[in-house]
């Protein structure tokens, strides 16, 4: 059985972003139940030199939408990184899910061999589609997703593995 690039990318991003919305909703509810402004969560960090929750959500969104676009051979939409509230961050994740829904499975046919170029600060990374997805897109996506999860958990939100995985 051949597994499609669409199933390996779109379906994984969609499920995980849906779970991200779930844990963010639990974060907001937890803050309200403890009588503090949920937007405090947006600025939280695990360590002083780490990116805040807001940036973790923005990067999770970016890796999903940009990776799908690169695999499809199209330009990704540009999202301004101007979110400051939990409500705005939830809206961004929803907008990312909406975008993923516009990329048809047919656009990713043959993308395992597509040349992908990723501009970095000091160089351009060049990979074929499948190694790009396996070794760049998914690991980076999950790094930022799990960091967002950990920030909520660290701040007392009652979430666990089932919330993260969606089972």
Per-segment meaning from a language model:
Residues 65-103:
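Helix-adjacent hinge/juxtasegments
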């Amino acid at each position: 059985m051949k597994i499609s690039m669409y199933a390996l990318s779109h379906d994984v991003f969609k499920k995980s972003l849906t779970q991200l919305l779930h844990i963010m909703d639990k974060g907001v509810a937890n803050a309200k139940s403890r009588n503090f402004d949920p937007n405090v969560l947006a600025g939280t960090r695990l360590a002083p030199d780490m990116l805040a929750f807001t940036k973790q959500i923005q990067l999770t969104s970016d890796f999903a939408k940009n990776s799908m676009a690169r695999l499809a051979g199209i330009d990704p939409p540009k999202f301004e990184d101007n979110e400051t509230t939990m409500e705005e961050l939830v809206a961004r994740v929803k907008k990312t899910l909406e975008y993923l829904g516009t990329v048809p499975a047919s656009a990713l046919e043959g993308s395992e061999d597509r040349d992908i170029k990723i501009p970095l600060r000091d160089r351009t990374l060049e990979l074929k589609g499948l190694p790009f997805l396996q070794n760049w897109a998914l690991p980076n996506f999950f790094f930022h997703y799990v960091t967002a999860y950990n920030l909520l958990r660290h701040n007392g939100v009652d979430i666990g593995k089932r919330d993260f995985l969606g089972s």
